Structure formats: structure tokens, C-alpha cells
């Protein structure tokens, strides 16, 4: 039986599940240790990533089912980028177990469609093709894209790269599966029906999730809350950890 890597830290009474993004692992959350006095943090390496080896390419529903199987019975869920889709899917599949949902630099539909801003599908397909040719360079390029434009871009990209290199790396099959989820998932309609506290955090400079998404979802999901970190890109918790932690604490405390 292939098992997921989970780690629980923190002294708080509320449970908070943290889900990382594509290509990364749970070590990416080390910069927000300030949450530990307030929450019991449940850190997981998604199936096939980091220390959760032995999985192949999975659909969004399959990945979410595997995570839910070992997640705490009741918790807040926070997901970054691809992890935001998994956290959202968990809330759709088992809403009774999700106290509230926080998505970070995430979109219910990452690919650009008709009137919807996002990553061009051919760019995502290109990444899939490049992975098979030059694994290391493609992952590095994707990490660099995540921090582009911020004052601390180089330093932040180095931090992300260290997270990848310090743990077992995902296979090309797993990474392609993740890109396929980003290319095809569209949770806009089902999430509009979700009746849970929902906070969406964005980076103003994010090149992967355009800030226009925040505005469109403000209109489509009026019961949700959005916050934009002015000088952040795709990893606001790395470039602006204090501001990020304050947002999380305030939102959960209010609910």
C-alpha cells in the first residue's frame, strides 16, 4: 500500500491542512512557521511528490480522494496553486469535513478559455512536452515564472528550488499528470454552489493566475472574500510571509 507523507506541527486548537503546488512538496510551508502557535498544521506531500512516492499520474478526483483518506476528520483547508484545486475538490466532495477553504494564487480554471483569463492551453501542453526532453530545466523554468516581478524574485526562486532538491523529485509521469489537471480542470460552476467560508489570496504580479480572476470571482462568488498582496507574484507566502499569516489568522478567527 502506497502511503502519503503527513506531518503535524503546531499547538493551536484548530486543524489546518496545507496543500502545496505543482512540482513542490510540504517543505514549501517552512516560511510560515508563525502559524504554529495558532493552529495544528497538517502538512502533506501530494501523491507522487516529495516523500509520497509510488503514485503515477492521477486525475484531480483521484488525488483528492487519496488526500482525504488520511486527512483530519474536520479541518480548514488551504491550497496553493494546484493545491488550491485539490482543496476545492475536497470541499466539493466532502463539505462536512471542511470548516472553510483558503485558496492561494489559485484559480478554479487555470487554462484560458473564451472570456476567462489564464494560462494559454498550448503553454501548458508545451511544458508537458518540454518535461520529457529536459526535466530539470523545465521545472526550474516553472519555478522562476512563479516569482517573476517581485523585489525578492531571485531569492524566492532559490528558496523554491531548494524545496524541490531537498526531497525526492516527482516523476515525469506525475508532473505531467499535474499539468494535465491544470490544463483541464474547471471548478467555476460547482464552487459557486459551495456554502463554506472561502478566502482567495492573490499576488498582484502573478504571471500564472491573472489578477483579473480575482475580480471575476468577486462577482461570480459574492459570498467569498478576496485579498490581493500588492507586491507578490505566484508565491505570496514566500515573498510576504508576515502579511500572509495575518490574513489567514484574521479570516479564520472571524469564522
Curated annotation (Swiss-Prot):
Residues 16-241 form the AB hydrolase-1 domain. Its EC number is 3.1.1.85. Pfam families: Abhydrolase_1. Keywords: Biotin biosynthesis, Cytoplasm, Hydrolase, Serine esterase. GO terms for molecular function: carboxylic ester hydrolase activity; pimelyl-[acyl-carrier protein] methyl ester esterase activity. GO terms for cellular component: cytoplasm. Coiled coil: none annotated. It comes from the Bacteria. One of its GO terms (biological process) is biotin biosynthetic process. HAMAP family: Carboxylester. NCBIfam families: bioH (TIGR01738). Monomer. PANTHER family: HYDROLASE ALPHA/BETA FOLD FAMILY, PIMELOYL-[ACYL-CARRIER PROTEIN] METHYL ESTER ESTERASE. The physiological role of BioH is to remove the methyl group introduced by BioC when the pimeloyl moiety is complete. It allows to synthesize pimeloyl-ACP via the fatty acid synthetic pathway through the hydrolysis of the ester bonds of pimeloyl-ACP esters. Also displays a weak thioesterase activity. Can form a complex with CoA, and may be involved in the condensation of CoA and pimelic acid into pimeloyl-CoA, a precursor in biotin biosynthesis. This is Pimeloyl-[acyl-carrier protein] methyl ester esterase. It comes from Serratia marcescens. The lineage of its organism: Bacteria, Pseudomonadati, Pseudomonadota, Gammaproteobacteria, Enterobacterales.
